[in-house]
UniProtKB/Swiss-Prot annotation:
Keywords: Phosphoprotein. Pfam families: DUF4660. It comes from Mus musculus (Mouse). Residues 48-61, 161-180 have a biased composition (Basic and acidic residues). The modification Phosphotyrosine is found at residue 130. Residues 1-66, 96-180 are annotated as: Disordered. InterPro entries: DUF4660 (IPR029089). Residues 149-160 have a biased composition (Acidic residues). This is UPF0690 protein C1orf52 homolog.
Length: 180
């Protein structure tokens, strides 16, 4: 049983051996193929093939420790500061005011205070309530002009859309009939 147990690192020992020879065979012929591959460099027939093969992982890591461009012979340490590449500095951006019709910022914004509407003259208001439009009643400048007696406005059916009004003479007898 101990002879059948494999060394876990034996897989890497046969680095570079062709897998086509041992694809259908069991583990014992693979070991035999590995031994042949290990002794092949000494024989003259397989010497050319050994030169073309890459070195095994152990040999490779023994020979290469650091890349030459990282090595600083004075300090014998990697000089990382020499290899740092800094991004170019961007100039500070200047603040430009956008031209728009938006509301200005709060510092410069002041609300325009509208004056209160003019107060209604109470004499005119009470005069209108009690229909006391005598000679001594105050006159409102905004009030419409009254028609002289004997005239009234009449709207015709044809001109309802235009709201045009016509003035006609009313006889004193007709005015009394319409009021009743």
């Amino acid at each position: 049983m101990a002879a059948e147990e494999k060394d876990p690192l034996s897989y890497f020992a046969a680095y570079g051996s062709s897998s086509s020879d041992s694809s259908d065979e069991n583990s014992e012929p693979e070991d035999a193929g590995r031994k042949e591959a290990a002794s092949a460099p000494t024989t003259g027939g397989r010497g050319k093939q050994a030169e073309k093969r890459l070195p095994g992982p152990d040999e490779l890591f023994r020979s290469v420790t650091r890349p030459a461009f990282l090595y600083n012979p004075l300090n014998k340490q990697i000089d990382w500061e020499r290899h740092v590449v800094k991004a170019p500095e961007e100039p500070p951006k200047e603040f430009k005011i956008w031209k728009s019709n938006c509301v200005p910022p709060p510092e410069t914004y002041t609300t325009e205070k509208k004056p209160p509407p003019p107060e209604l003259d109470m004499a005119i208001k009470w005069s209108n309530i009690y229909e006391d439009n005598g000679d001594d009643a105050p006159q409102n400048a905004k009030k419409a002009r009254l028609l002289p007696e004997g005239e009234e406005t009449v709207e015709s059916d044809d001109d309802k859309d235009e709201r045009a009004s016509k003035i006609r003479r009313v006889e004193p007898g007709e005015a009394a009939k319409k009021k009743k």
